[in-house]
Amino acid sequence: MGSCLSSDLPPRAGAGAGASPGWPQRWRRRRQRGVERGGAVSGGGGGVFSIGVGGKKLHHGGGGGGEMTEEELAKVEGRVCVNGASAAACLHTQQGRKGTNQDAMVVWENFNTSDSVFCGVFDGHGPYGHFVAKKVRDSLPVKIRTLWKTSANEDTSSHQNGSISGSVNSEESPVVDDEWGEYADDSEKLPEMFLPLKQSYFKAFKLMDKELKMHPTVDCFCSGSTAVTLVKQGLDLVVGNLGDSRAIMGTRDAANNLTAVQLTVDLKPNLPREAARIQQCRGRVFALQDEPEVARVWLPNNDSPGLAMARAFGDFCLKDYGLISVPQISYRRLTEKDEFIILATDGVWDVLSNKEAVDIVAAAPSRATAARALVDCAVRSWRLKFPTSKSDDCAVVCLFLDHAKSPDLIQENESEEETTEDVAIPDTVAKVDQDIAQGDAHISSEEQITEPALQHSYTLRDVDEIVPVEEPPVSKEPERCGSARSLADCISTNEEEEWSALEGVTRVNSLLNLPRILSGEKRSTSWRKRR
C-alpha cells in the first residue's frame, strides 16, 4: 500500500531539508513553533527521533542518554528488522509492483523482561510513506519500552504533565477519548501488567505522531503509516493496532482443528464509529464510483486526499478532520491451544483469507521460512487472482507460541522439518490452482480484458464482517480470474520477469491524490518542486 495515483515522485536524498514551500502557512508556522520550543530534535536523516516527555529526552533501558540511534538498535541482541528469523519468530517482506517498498517490520525479543517480545508491522503510504514506516519502526518500540519500564516502577500520576496529560490525542481531534482505544473481553481478568502497558501505548503513539509532525526532514503532510504491534509477556498478550494492517492467531478448536482468530479490526472509514468521528470533525467519508467498496476520508471542501483508513501516523492534512493516531488496544490470555500469531500488511489480506494464511504458515517446511512462505503465496495469489493489477508490498511477522514444549523438543522438530524435501501446499492454495487449471483454461483473451480489475477488495469488509474478532468457520471461495497460468508457472517465474500486471492498473490505494488547496490558501508551488 502507499501508491499515489496523482504523483510519481522520486524520493529525495535524505528526505530533503525543511518543510516544503508548498505547505500551507498555518502548517509551517505550527511546525516551526514546535521546533523552537524544543519539542523535537532531528535524528540526522537516518537516525531515531529524540523527543521526550515534557521536553526531556527519553532514556532507553540500556542506560544511555536519549533514544537509540540506528547503530545502537542494530547492536541490540534479539532485535531483527530485516528478512530473517529469531529464536521465537520469523519475518519477511517483499516489494510489490507499485514502486518503493513502503512496508517495515521488527521483532524484539527480551523486550522488557526475559520472557517478553515485541513484534510490529508498519505499512507506509503517500509520497514518503517508506520514510515514515521506517521511522516508526525504529522509534515506537523504544518509546513503548521506555514508558513501560518507567510506569511499572512509579505511580501513574507522577508521569502526568503538560505534554501527555488530558486526552490521548486532544491536539489532533477534540473527540478522542479512551473509548477509541481499548476493547477487551469482559470475562478476561486483566493482569497487573496491562494497565501500565496500555498507558505506555497511548503515550508512545501520541509522542510518535507529534515527532513526525515536527520533524524537519520527513514530510508527513500527505504521507503516513499504519502500525499493528504486539507485546507478549509470558502468557499475556497485548495488541495495539492503528490502521488497516492485521493480526491473526492460529489456534486449535475443541476438535483439535487449526482455526484462525482475528485479533484486530481493520480500522477503515466504513466502520460506523470511525465514520461518525470523522464527520463530527467536518471530514467527509465516501467511496468513488469505480471502487464502491472502498470508503475513503476526504477534506471538507476538497476531493483529496482520499485516505483508505481511519487511523494512521502522519497524514497531517487530515488530522484536523477526524483522522487520529490513537491505537486500539486489546488483551488476550494465551492458552496451550494457541500456536502462532501472524502480523501482516494489507498486501497479504487483499488476496488471502485469515484461514488461508494460517494454513500456509502451518504447512511451511520450517519456522524460519514460514513468513517467506506466506509472502510468496500472497504474491502468487496476486498474479492468479488479479493478473491485470500491480501487486502490493507484503510484510509478514510470524510469532510462534510455545507453552508446553521444551526447547530440546522444539529444536528437534525444526531439524526434522528442515530436512523435508517436499514443501506441503495448503489445500486453499491448491484449490485455487485446481480451479484455474480445470475451469478457466477455456476463457478467451477478449473475456479476460473485459473482466473488471477493481471488482473486489479483500481488505475492506462490511460492518458485519469486520466487527467480530473471530472469523466465521466457513471460508469464502476464492474468486476466479481470467488467467490460465498454473501455480507451478507462478512459482517458477523469476522476480525480475516483466509480467502483465506491470502494465495493469493499481488496485486499492491508500492515498488517491494530494490536496492542492487547504483552508482557502493556495499552495505556492507544486508538490513536485522540492530542493
UniProtKB/Swiss-Prot annotation:
This is Probable protein phosphatase 2C 66. It is an enzyme of class 3 (hydrolase). Belongs to the PP2C family. It comes from the Eukaryota. Its cofactor is Mg(2+); Mn(2+). It comes from Oryza sativa subsp. japonica. Residues 10-25 have a biased composition (Low complexity). Mn(2+) 1 binds at residues 123-124. The keyword Repeat does not apply. Residues 1-47, 151-176 are annotated as: Disordered. Residues 151-172 have a biased composition (Polar residues). The keyword Nucleotidyltransferase does not apply. InterPro entries: PP2C, PPM-type-like_dom_sf, PPM-type_phosphatase-like_dom. Mn(2+) 2 binds at residues 123, 346, 392. Residues 88-401 form the PPM-type phosphatase domain. Keywords: Hydrolase, Magnesium, Manganese, Metal-binding, Protein phosphatase.
